[in-house]
Amino acid sequence: MATPVNAQCSSKTWELSLYELHRTPQEAIMDGTEIAVSPRSLHSELMCPICLDMLKNTMTTKECLHRFCSDCIVTALRSGNKECPTCRKKLVSKRSLRPDPNFDALISKIYPSRDEYEAHQDRVLAKLNRLHNQQALSSSIEEGLKMQAMHRAQRVRKHQHESDNTTFSGGEDNCDSRSHVSNPSVHSNQEAGPSRKRSRASEDSGAEPDLSHEGGVRSPDPPGGGETGSEIELVFRAHPLLVEKDGYSQTRYVKTTANATVDHLSKYLALRIALEEEVLRGEAEGVTLGEVSEKQYTIYICTGVAGGQYTTLNGSLTLELVNEKYWKVSKPLELYYAPTKEQK
């Protein structure tokens, strides 16, 4: 049975929506008027959806016409599913892509100094990485100082425990030797030799000043008595106000004992700088200790909360006192040096 003609016509009729009925075409600008558009507003149109950076060597998909960087879309097709990252439409291979030189030309027209922009971006990233590495270094130094302090305390306790065990075992030996000496008739002449040696050893140990009168028991050593003083890490920097920028301004990292004084650091600094200056000049003669004095350099420490205030340190102060009085933080002690005014 044939379909009526009016039914065919009604099925092919396009019914306009309310929006389509009332919309008007946009008037074209024909008088040469220029409209200013900021590049930032075009960023979403010129951005690669994969790397979120500006498109580079633009490739367009043939099916859905989405744009990507050449390296980004090729890597995505190799490592992921064979589909468009934006709309998930099927992409068989690189044959589903085509280069878009016109879009690259448009980007180069909008951003003529793109190479300079990328170079600036690389410099900023390198600076951020360098600052991140410095922060990691300072945090690792702090963790190292904490671990050193913890191990040092354990070492002191272990040393005290071992010394106590040694002294008590020595007291038992003395008691045994006295029992052997007091009963010579029980033992044979062959066993009398070792007993006499042990009694003589107990008499010799009894002459030591740190044994008590009862049983020869050794008194416990004072804390840290068998070890050297604790170590302090410090950073030497040139004084920012008293040392010229083109002068000698090397930063030094020193690790020494806490009982070292400021004069020790001044003399060490004078000797090191004199040796390095001779190496730079190429002189063969070495520097004698008589020519180096701790008066050549003055040591300062920054005491201001916001920086800029420097206090001169007395040469007789130990680093432990300086750390307790001025620093009081779990970071390497920061000191500043400058030539003494009389030595300039």
Swiss-Prot record:
Gene Ontology molecular function, alphabetical: chromatin binding; histone H2AK119 ubiquitin ligase activity; ubiquitin protein ligase activity; zinc ion binding
Q: What GO biological process, any one, is recorded here?
A: negative regulation of transcription by RNA polymerase II
**Which species is this record about?**
Xenopus laevis
Q: What is this protein called?
A: E3 ubiquitin-protein ligase RING2-A
Assembly behavior: Component of chromatin-associated Polycomb (PcG) complexes. Component of a PRC1-like complex. Component of some MLL1/MLL complex.
**What ranges does the record list as Polar residues composition bias?**
180-192
Enzyme Commission number(s) from the entry:
2.3.2.27
- InterPro entries cross-referenced by the UniProt entry: RAWUL, RING1/RING2, Znf_RING, Znf_RING/FYVE/PHD, Znf_RING_CS
